[in-house]
């Protein structure tokens, strides 16, 4: 349900990083399971779906990786759509580029390896896993660059061989689409966390897409609801 035709729910539902301990994990599953039914999540779906109550939840459990740096890669130039260039945003620590921190932004030519720097990482702190659970913030290294040459070569190799290693990436119309990849580096080795069709630029727009969806809800406070009435739901034909 996170990615549907004309709708991306990236960042809409709850993600809990680095949950430590069995009891804490069970409690976290309950919170994540319920998150599609918060007023915020339900309201956004209601603006774009005819039956937003039809949500069939699944949860993905991933082992936490204490990445030295992490980011997002799109297999095209997000400014002009050129497929011979990859767009990369990366920060020190965990998840900074995904969550809108000021990231190192690069365009990397897949054929020549040439790198064009659009922005440098200026976030003063990086997020790292706390052994007791959750994340803590530590000072960033202050380095002028985040990605090193060897790491850039790994990203180029990954992007070049992606079509051979994974099923075709297509949009909701079945047409070829660029890949949106979340990655990290641990001790110089590339780690892949997520791969999906590229529907929206989280690197350039942050959560602008969700803010756009918010716009349709701005007048919702004017709607009056009779709490004694039975909620109206969409009627669907049933087969026996």
Region locations from a protein language model:
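Conserved mixed alpha/beta core segments that line enzyme active sites in large multi-domain catalysts
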Residues: 1-215
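N-terminal, non-catalytic alpha-helical interaction modules of very large eukaryotic scaffold proteins
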Residues: 205-240
């Amino acid at each position: 349900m996170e990615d549907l035709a004309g709708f991306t729910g990236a960042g809409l539902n709850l993600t809990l990083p680095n949950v430590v301990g069995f009891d804490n994990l069970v409690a976290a599953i309950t919170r994540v399971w319920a998150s599609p039914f918060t007023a915020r999540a339900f309201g956004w779906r209601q603006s774009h779906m005819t039956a937003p109550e039809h949500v069939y939840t699944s949860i993905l459990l991933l082992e936490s990786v204490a990445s030295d740096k992490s980011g997002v890669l799109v297999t095209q130039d997000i400014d002009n759509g050129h497929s011979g260039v990859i767009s990369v945003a990366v920060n020190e620590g965990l998840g900074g580029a995904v969550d809108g921190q000021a990231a190192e932004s690069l365009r990397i030519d897949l054929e020549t390896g040439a790198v064009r720097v659009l922005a440098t990482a200026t976030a003063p702190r990086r997020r790292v896993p706390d052994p007791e659970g959750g994340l803590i913030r530590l000072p960033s290294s202050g380095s002028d660059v985040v990605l090193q040459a060897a790491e850039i070569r790994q990203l180029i190799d990954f992007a070049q061989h992606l079509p051979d290693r994974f099923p075709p990436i297509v949009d909701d119309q079945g047409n070829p689409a660029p890949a949106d990849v979340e990655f990290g580096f641990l001790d110089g080795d590339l780690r892949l966390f997520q791969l999906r069709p590229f529907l929206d630029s989280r690197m350039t727009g942050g959560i602008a897409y969700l803010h756009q969806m918010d716009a349709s809800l701005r007048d919702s406070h004017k709607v009056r609801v009779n709490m004694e009435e039975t909620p109206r739901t969409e009627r669907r034909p049933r087969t026996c």
